């Protein structure tokens, strides 16, 4: 009798697992993989939550940058929306003043608009980036540590 009950529980568990395998579930809470230091200085992790989904037509990526990390100037071939879920970020579009984004802030960057965004000098940042399935990011100019430090000093005086 005990063996029958054990077998029954195992079958129910296997059945539940097979039912769950019918779904493609990902989590934005997963840190992701450490990004190679190609277009930034510091430490960053990326989690491609939804990537190249042709039915949806957009991607969702979670990015986490440690404090005092930079991200180079770049453009996207589609609009991009950033949703700040933890920490604080610097954000700047070419020709405009930089600003600080905080938890709960949502900002849209129009397609082909040159911009950069990253953690602040004192705070890590985690954000969700929503963007279309267009061409890859076009990296346009290195954001120097000196320029980043100038931005940080500017906000210390505010």
Per-range role (PLM):
Residues 76-90, 94-95:
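Glycine- and acidic-residue-biased ligand/ion/polar-headgroup-sensing regions
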Residues 73, 91-92, 114-120:
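Short beta-strand His + acidic residue motifs that chelate non-heme Fe in jelly-roll/DSBH
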Residues 122-141:
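A short hydrophobic beta-strand segment most commonly corresponding to one strand
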Residues 17-57, 138-158:
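A short, N-terminal "cap"/entry segment at the start of jelly-roll beta-barrel domains
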Residues 4-14:
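Sec-dependent N-terminal signal peptides
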Residues 59-76:
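Conserved short histidine dyad/triad with adjacent acidic residue
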Residues 95-112:
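Short acidic-glycine-tyrosine-enriched beta hairpin
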């Amino acid at each position: 009798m005990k063996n029958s009950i054990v077998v029954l529980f195992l079958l129910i568990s296997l059945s539940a697992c097979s039912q769950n395998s019918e779904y493609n579930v990902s989590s934005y809470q997963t840190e992701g993989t450490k990004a190679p230091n190609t277009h930034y200085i510091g430490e960053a992790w990326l989690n491609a939550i939804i990537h190249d989904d042709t039915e949806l037509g957009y991607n969702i990526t979670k990015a986490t940058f440690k404090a005092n990390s930079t991200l180079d100037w770049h453009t996207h071939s589609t609009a991009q929306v950033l949703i700040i879920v933890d920490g604080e970020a610097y954000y700047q579009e070419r020709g405009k003043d930089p600003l600080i984004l905080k938890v709960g802030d949502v900002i849209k960057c129009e397609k082909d608009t040159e911009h950069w965004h990253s953690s602040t000098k004192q705070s890590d940042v985690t954000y969700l980036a929503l963007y279309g399935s267009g061409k890859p990011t076009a990296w346009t100019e290195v954001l120097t540590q000196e320029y980043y430090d100038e931005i940080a000093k500017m906000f210390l005086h505010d």
